Structure formats: C-alpha cells, structure tokens
C-alpha cells in the first residue's frame, strides 16, 4: 500500500485504505487518457546553472506539476528527467478522464508561467512546456519484479501522447481526435491539420487546446 503514495494522490490512498474506493492493479485493457509533458528550454538552463542552483528549480517544478496532476485525479506513470508521463482513468475508474487530463494540462501551463517569473524574473529566457494528450485503449497494470513493481500503461495510444508533446510548440497543448471528440464542447480547440506518426498506418488530425470555455 505504501507504493500507492508514489503515483496517486494522498486523498485517493486514504479512500482505498478505508475501503471507500475499489482499485485493481492487475493488468487489464482499459480506455484511458494519457498526458505527456516536456519542459522546453530546461536543457540550456542545465548548461548555465550549477547543480545546487538547478536542483531546487527542477524539484519545485516536479512537485507543483505533480500536485496539479493529483488534484485532477491523475496517476503518475513516471518522471523522465524534466518530462512527466501520467494517465487518467486508472486505477480508480473516472468517466471524465479526457476532460480532467486537458484541465490538468492547462493548469500546468498556468502554474509554470508563475514559476518562470519567480525563477527568472525579467530575464529573456524561453522556458515552457509542450504537452500531448490522447485517449484510447491501452494495457494498464502493475509490471516488473517483486522488488520493483511499476504501475504503468503500454500500447500505441500511450506512445501517441509522447509524440504529440514532441511536436507541440512551447506552451502548447495538443490533443488527438478521440480526446477532442470527448472535450470539444468544454474547451476552445483549433484543428492544426493531419500529421503522420510512427506506428500509425494513416495520418492523424491534431488539435490545439487554447482555453476552457465552460463557465
């Protein structure tokens, strides 16, 4: 049970431990929404700052982003340097996982703007996130040896979120058609055209989420 605290919110852990919420870590097929966030401009910052200056910045960034993810019911898959892979809809079922993922992305962008001003002040330095989101069926569950289990997702849909984040411009949130179909009336969304991704036989339409439109 201690392992739960590393990838879901303390509130969810308490609900599970009290028996108020069911969960399932065994491998299964499920429709989830995946989010991949990539921090842009951080590599150049690494080259300019000393480790003792850099560590507090990265730790604060990851802490703040994780808190936002947990607030929206997300599950941390893994941290990849300054990147974060997360998913919504497991281990606790959530019908609003596409909406919660997009809301998370916009909240992450807003928080980074605050942090950037705190860290860099008026310095003219580019620092922002590119975020990719997709909704689809993946395999989700606990994998690995007993000594190092990980609760993670696998499948082509999980990879698409990462590839969307890579083509996203700084401070841009890109989503797939399936995610767009589920949240298009809640957010202002702009179609950007077809893109070809590795592992897909046909091009895929990509959408840019600008802002929420729900009152």
Task: Map each language-model feature to its residues.
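Regulatory cytosolic signal-relay segments
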Residues: 1-29, 187
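Catalytic NTP-binding/metal-coordinating core of nucleotidyl cyclase/transferase enzymes
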Residues: 4-5, 22-104
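Catalytic strand-loop-helix junctions within cyclic-nucleotide turnover domains
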Residues: 87-97, 131-149, 170-172
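Acidic/histidine metal-binding catalytic segments
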Residues: 80, 121-130, 173-179
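Short, surface-exposed loop/helix-turn segments at secondary-structure junctions
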Residues: 120-121, 143-155
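A structural signal for short, well-ordered beta-strand segments
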Residues: 34, 84, 129-135, 206
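Alpha-helical scaffold within the catalytic cores of cyclic-nucleotide enzymes
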Residues: 58-74, 90-131, 135, 156-165
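Cytosolic regulatory/linker segments at or just downstream of nucleotide-handling modules
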Residues: 138-140, 167-215
